[in-house]
C-alpha cells in the first residue's frame, strides 16, 4: 500500500508532485449550526488529520479550528442571489460578500463558492483578496481516471476536487467503496458537508425531508439515518487515511 498523508489545500504545489500521495479533506460549512460543525470536528480529532474548512459565517468554533496547526480556513461565498436575483431584494455585491468573509477569515488563501459559482471575472476579484487557490471545479472520480491541479493565467492555482458527498447523493452512489476511491491515482480532494455527516444522509430526499429540524439538536440527532450514509463513508475514509499516516 502506498503511504498517504493528509494535507491542507494551501500545501499543494503544482511544480512538485508530492500532492499525488496526499489526500485532501475539505468541508463546506454551509451555515451549519455549531453542534453540527462540532460533531465533524470531534470525528476529525480522533485521528489528527489535516483539513481545510470553507467558511460561510462567523462562529466561536473558528477559534478551535485556528488552534489546530493541521487545519486551515478558506471561504465559501454565496453568489446565488446575484444570479437568481429578485428585483425586490437588497443584494450585496461580489466585493461586499468578499469583504464580509475576509473580515471573518483574513488569513484565507482558498475559495470554493457555494454551488461552485465561478467565472473569469470572479477569479480576478478573488485574486484582489489574496486568494491563491480556486477550488470551484469538480471532476467526479467515476468519470475520469486521473486529475491534477494546474496554474491559471493569473498565477492562481486551480484545485479540482473529485469526491463530494452531495454529488454522490445526486448520483445515488450508495455502494461506493471509500478504499478504492482513496487509492486512485492523481489529485484526491474530498468535499464533505458537516450537515450530511451529522445526519448520515443517504439520499437527497432524506436531507430535504429534515430541513425544518436542522437547528434542533435533539430532533436532528433522533432522525440520524441508521443505514449506510455519508457519515459512515466519512468515517471509513478518515480511518483509512489515519492508518496510512502511521
Q: What are these model-derived regions, one by one?
A:
Residues 30, 112-113:
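A generic secondary-structure micro-motif detector
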Residues 19-29, 75-92, 221-222:
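Glycine-rich phosphate-binding "P-loop"
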Residues 56, 78-80, 113-116, 138:
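Beta-hairpin (beta-strand-turn-beta-strand) motif
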Residues 79-107, 113, 169-173:
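Ligand-binding grooves and catalytic loops that recognize ribose/phosphate and carbohydrate rings
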Residues 1-70, 99, 103-107, 119-132, ...:
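Terminal accessory/targeting
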Amino acid at each position: 500500500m502506498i503511504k498517504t498523508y493528509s494535507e491542507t489545500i494551501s500545501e499543494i504545489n503544482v511544480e512538485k508532485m508530492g500532492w499525488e500521495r496526499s489526500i485532501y479533506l475539505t468541508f463546506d460549512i454551509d451555515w451549519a449550526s455549531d453542534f453540527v460543525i462540532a460533531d465533524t470536528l470531534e470525528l476529525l480529532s480522533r485521528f489528527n488529520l489535516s483539513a481545510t474548512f470553507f467558511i460561510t459565517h462567523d462562529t466561536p468554533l473558528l477559534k478551535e479550528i485556528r488552534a489546530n496547526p493541521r487545519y486551515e480556513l478558506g471561504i465559501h461565498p454565496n453568489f446565488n442571489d446575484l444570479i437568481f436575483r429578485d428585483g425586490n431584494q437588497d443584494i450585496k455585491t461580489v466585493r461586499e460578500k468578499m469583504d464580509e468573509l475576509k473580515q471573518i477569515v483574513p488569513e484565507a488563501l482558498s475559495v470554493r463558492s457555494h454551488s461552485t459559482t465561478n467565472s473569469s471575472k470572479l477569479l480576478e476579484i478573488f485574486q484582489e483578496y489574496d486568494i491563491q487557490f480556486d477550488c470551484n471545479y469538480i471532476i467526479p472520480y467515476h468519470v475520469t481516471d486521473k486529475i491534477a491541479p494546474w496554474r491559471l493565467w493569473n498565477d492562481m492555482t486551480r484545485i479540482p476536487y473529485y469526491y463530494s458527498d452531495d454529488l454522490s447523493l445526486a448520483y445515488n452512489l450508495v455502494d461506493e467503496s471509500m478504499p478504492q476511491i482513496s487509492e486512485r491515482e492523481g489529485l484526491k480532494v474530498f468535499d464533505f458537508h458537516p450537515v450530511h455527516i451529522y445526519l448520515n444522509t443517504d439520499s437527497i430526499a432524506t436531507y430535504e425531508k429534515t430541513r425544518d429540524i436542522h437547528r434542533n439538536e435533539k430532533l436532528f440527532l433522533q432522525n440520524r439515518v441508521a443505514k449506510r450514509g455519508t457519515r459512515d463513508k466519512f468515517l471509513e475514509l478518515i480511518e483509512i487515511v489515519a492508518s496510512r499516516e502511521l
